[in-house]
Amino acid sequence: KWCFRVCYRGICYRRCR
């Protein structure tokens, strides 16, 4: 598992997979 930051339309959040 690993996490990375996702930013879209000024909103950033962390996604883990």
UniProtKB/Swiss-Prot annotation:
Subcellular localization(s) per the UniProt record: Secreted
Stated family: Belongs to the tachyplesin/polyphemusin family.
One of the record's GO cellular component terms: extracellular region
Any one Gene Ontology BP term: defense response to bacterium
Disulfide pattern: C3-C16, C7-C12
Signal peptide stretch: none
Annotated organism of origin: Tachypleus gigas
Keywords: Amidation, Antibiotic, Antimicrobial, Disulfide bond, Secreted
Positions bearing Arginine amide: R17
Name by which UniProt lists this protein: Tachyplesin-1
Summary of the tissues where the protein is detected: Hemocytes.
